[in-house]
A protein has these predicted regions:
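Substrate-binding groove of N-acetylhexosamine-processing glycoside hydrolases
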Residues: 21, 25, 64-67, 73, ...
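Activation corresponds to long, low-complexity, non-globular regions
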Residues: 483-488, 497-504, 519-521, 573-630
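Extracellular carbohydrate recognition and processing domains
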Residues: 497-500, 510-545, 585-593
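Exposed beta-strand face motif in extracellular beta-rich ectodomains
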Residues: 547-551
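Short beta-strand-plus-loop segments that form exposed binding edges in beta-rich domains
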Residues: 553-559
Length: 631
């Protein structure tokens, strides 16, 4: 492939210049010829001088990075979005006036002020000046304008007036792209790149924009034959065929987490004429990139040879070079670990332990036991550092699964579904707290080494929060207060796990007139757990000594959400749905949730695209009130 690019996200998590240079050393020797810097507003300039010195880079510092990359024969492309993902620009009193939600309106997915208004002339004046300053730093022929996930088009009074006068959101998007193109291509003489996901919502826009805009086609599903849309109904479609037909050039953009994502997206792309590949790496605030270096090197080498033949052998060859070992058992083991993927540690209160998690617990223990003996055999300082980070990732995975198991045991203990002595739970919780302390210490040491002087220390924040959560639960077990709780189980049907339906659950107890709020938020499943799809169980605590009489379930937002069953277990008994009392809004098959089977009650619109295109539909509340009875 002509362009073999790798992106580092220094907008969400700053890195030191030394680390960026180290990353350039590694990637330039791994087949890459381009470094993409995801910046947002991280560079402090005359136009945008508001970022604190310790939270931003100077133009001179970035020029130092560009010069270093040039010596390694790597081009450096900046990414500065001028539509969505502009929160770094909009968080200052001098610039907040550029925001689309500046008048206090709520956007599609909340009040996050991250989108600029495309109807204000000063928006373009600001970005033209800032883009000119950024372009002076980066001599690359390319300039990436972001423009992904622009959820809030048409919300401010100026934009609403344009829509009232006959323009569509797609028209506004097209005019914005043309204005930006006139700046980037017309005035700065750069080739404009952009993310392509918004054309899933506004497909008619593609035929109205300049054909020399380069599309960056990002897809992160582990296995891809034909890509799916990112949010709207996850429709299967063929974007590269469309780009070839219309005459656009494009890059494919997988993510670093899983090699199979890189392989299958590349395999799909090689049926067409990609300009290259861009491996995206996003925020690493609570971890580091080291553990992903084998995946990163693999993608670079894969694109360097432009074929997906024998990817397993290529991956093992990359690992031979990194770790200096040719032992086949080691290479097979490392290959299995990296293909195994990873989960995030901050979802341990989500629901009961799943079948997939049970299996992963066994696998993690096996991986740790088998790979640990190779630690002293790994050669080279970089190889040793990467190996230690992989070991740490396995340890964190084990910690996460132990916390998940701990929470599941607590729910069984409270509900009486399993006889567990509290001393066993106390012992398990104490071991988890000790392990959290150890992991936090290791991460803190890594931070001091790789990110000296960069604050806040997000790893400390994460593990401190988790420690306090576990510690609080442990104190309840020790005092016996945990038995004052009951357990509420709700099983969702979520055909689109990327949906964003906001949910409110309230409970009314016998003899009480007031609804008690139980949960408010978006029930996001772990999309990497195939043992649940599309049914996901979530758990909440309720009163242990009151008789639950009714459940109120409300939802609003873009799309819909299904419920297959719900139940409560506490000291007063086991309670399940008896009847549906009333519904409002759009509720399909309201009686389906009365029986614990595969059917579902659906609240909202199953066509998320239709709701996305109508602001008012996203504000509609859909609700169902359910009476409970004791089994």
């Amino acid at each position: 492939m002509k362009i073999r690019a790798v992106q580092i996200d220094i907008a969400r998590q700053m890195e030191t210049l030394d680390y960026i240079k180290h990353f350039i050393d590694f990637t330039s020797s791994s087949g890459y010829n381009t470094l993409v810097l995801y910046l947002e507003g991280r560079i402090r300039t005359n136009t945008f001088p508001f970022m604190a010195e310790n939270e931003s880079y100077t133009p001179e510092e970035m020029k130092e990075v560009v010069d270093y990359a040039d010596r390694k024969k790597m081009d450096v492309i900046p990414v500065v979005s001028n539509f969505a993902h502009t929160e770094q620009f909009l968080c200052f009193k001098e610039t907040v006036r550029f925001g689309e939600l500046r008048e206090g309106r709520t956007g599609r997915f909340g009040n996050n002020i991250s989108t600029v208004c495309p109807s204000k002339e000063e928006t373009y004046e600001f970005f033209e000046n800032y883009y000119r300053e950024i372009a002076d730093i980066f001599p690359s022929p390319y300039f990436h304008i972001g423009n992904d996930e622009v959820w809030d088009i048409g919300f401010c009074s100026l934009c609403r007036n344009r829509i009232k006068e006959g323009e569509t959101e797609a028209d506004i998007f097209v005019k914005h792209l043309k204005r930006t193109y006139n700046i980037v291509a017309g005035k700065l003489g750069k080739k404009m790149m952009m993310w392509d996901d918004m054309f899933e919502y506004y497909p008619e826009a593609l035929e109205k924009i300049p054909r020399d805009i380069i599309m960056c086609c990002w897809h992160y599903d582990t296995f891809i034959d034909i890509p799916k849309t990112h949010f709207g109904n996850r429709k299967r479609f063929d974007p590269l065929a469309t780009y070839d037909k219309l005459g656009f050039k494009y890059l494919i953009a997988p993510r670093e987490i899983h090699p199979e994502n890189v392989i299958t997206l590349t395999e799909y792309a090689l049926n067409y004429k990609p300009l290259g590949g861009l491996l995206t790496i996003w925020e690493k605030g609570t971890d580091f990139m080291l553990e992903d270096y084998p995946n990163i090197a693999f993608a670079g080498k894969l694109w360097e040879r432009s074929t997906v033949d024998n990817p397993d052998d290529l991956y093992k060859g990359v690992c031979k070079k990194i770790f200096g070992l040719t032992n086949s058992a080691f290479l097979d083991l490392l290959f299995s670990i990296k293909y195994y993927g990873r989960w995030h540690i901050n979802k341990f209160l989500r629901g009961p332990l799943t079948p997939c998690e049970h299996i992963r617990m066994k696998l993690v223990a096996f991986f740790e036991k088998q790979i640990k003996p190779f630690e002293k055999k790994v050669k080279g300082s970089i190889g040793k550092e990467i190996f230690r980070d992989i070991l740490l990732r396995l340890r964190i995975e084990r910690l996460h699964l132990n916390m998940r198991s701990f929470f599941s045991s607590i729910c069984k203990y409270i509900s009486g579904r399993k006889e567990i002595h509290p001393d066993i739970l106390i012992s398990e919780g104490t071991r988890i707290l000790q392990e959290i302390d150890i992991v936090k210490g290791i991460r803190s040491a890594q931070w001091k080494r790789f990110r000296p002087g960069i604050f806040p220390v997000k790893t400390d924040t994460l593990y401190t929060e988790i420690y306090r959560e576990i510690e609080g639960i442990l104190k309840e077990i020790q005092s016996g207060r945990i038995l004052r709780r009951g357990v509420f189980y709700i099983r969702y049907f979520l055909p689109d796990p990327y949906g964003s339906q906001k949910v409110r659950i309230a409970i009314k107890y016998k003899g009480e007139k007031k609804w008690n709020d139980l949960y408010s938020g978006i029930p996001k499943p772990d999309i990497d757990d195939p043992s649940q799809i599309p049914y996901y169980t979530f758990t909440h605590f309720v009163s242990g000594f009151k008789v639950p009489e009714k459940i109120l379930f409300q939802t609003y937002g873009y799309g819909g959400i299904g419920i297959t069953f719900l139940e409560i277990v506490n000291k007063k008994g086991h309670f399940i749905p008896a009847r549906t009392d009333r519904t409002s809004g759009k509720v399909s098959n309201p009686d389906a949730l009365l029986i614990d089977d595969t059917r579902w009650t659906y609240l909202g619109e199953i066509n998320t695209v239709r709701m996305y295109q109508d602001h008012k539909k996203g504000e509609e509340i859909h609700s169902i009130e359910i009476s409970l009875s004791r089994v």
